[in-house]
């Protein structure tokens, strides 16, 4: 009888031990799951330093970025990119009663990295927007563009509060690393090249150049810059090997499929020089100009335009 009782007790002890071990594993597993669920997630936006070429008396800038697209702001004195590390905010983190999103944590940052076009090697400098802002509940939008005014480069930034959709627009003076309200810039939002585009549009020449650049080279021409079409397929088709540009600037031509932008710096910009230069660059190797035509809207007559001055003369003889 005692031997039977000992066996029963032994079995019970074993069962209790197994049960305890199972419960311990479940608690441990649950704890890990909770930690994983509560672990803070972050959204990062970082654009590596692009390839930069400054050429032709430092008037023109060629910027290439490996793997194509990315946030870059193209200026007179700086090429700027974002370096951002921000919390991913979910509903549980928002205090609706206090009408706001969580405060900016110490490990969050919203920085603008700017590469100096006027210094050898294009060294970088960091503008820490959160430090300049002093506000601890606004987060920045993941977007970058450039506004040029008063001979300075500015980066507009949209700030927002997650909890109540409140937003604020500021503008960052990259040269002096200061913040100003966007309201102080009356000309903001107006196209810098609208007048140049109108000049080139006489006789539909502007659209003629755009069409030629797209069909021949899969590049997008505008009154102020050249970049690539958005689709990856178009990038793969880019081939400028038989152009004057490739002959004159072989190092840049090698990076053409990674082109982010080719532009004339704002302070040095003139419609005449941009127009004439592009016609020469993208002419077939050995030829003077890309073949483009002005069209008389009344008669349909086409006239080849070989320079900005020729376009002006044609326009004077064909008033609309």
Residues of each region from the PLM?
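Surface-exposed loop/turn elements that mediate protein-protein interactions on large endomembrane-trafficking
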Residues: 35-64, 97-136, 167-194, 207-272, ...
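Short glycine/acidic-enriched loop and turn motifs that connect beta-strands
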Residues: 85-90, 95-97, 160-165
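N-terminal Sec-pathway targeting helices
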Residues: 1-13, 24
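Sec-dependent signal peptide cleavage junction
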Residues: 21-36
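Repeated scaffold domains used in trafficking and secretory/extracellular systems
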Residues: 65-72, 135-147, 187-199
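Structural signature of eukaryotic scaffold interfaces centered on beta-propeller domains
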Residues: 53-55, 60-75, 144-151, 317
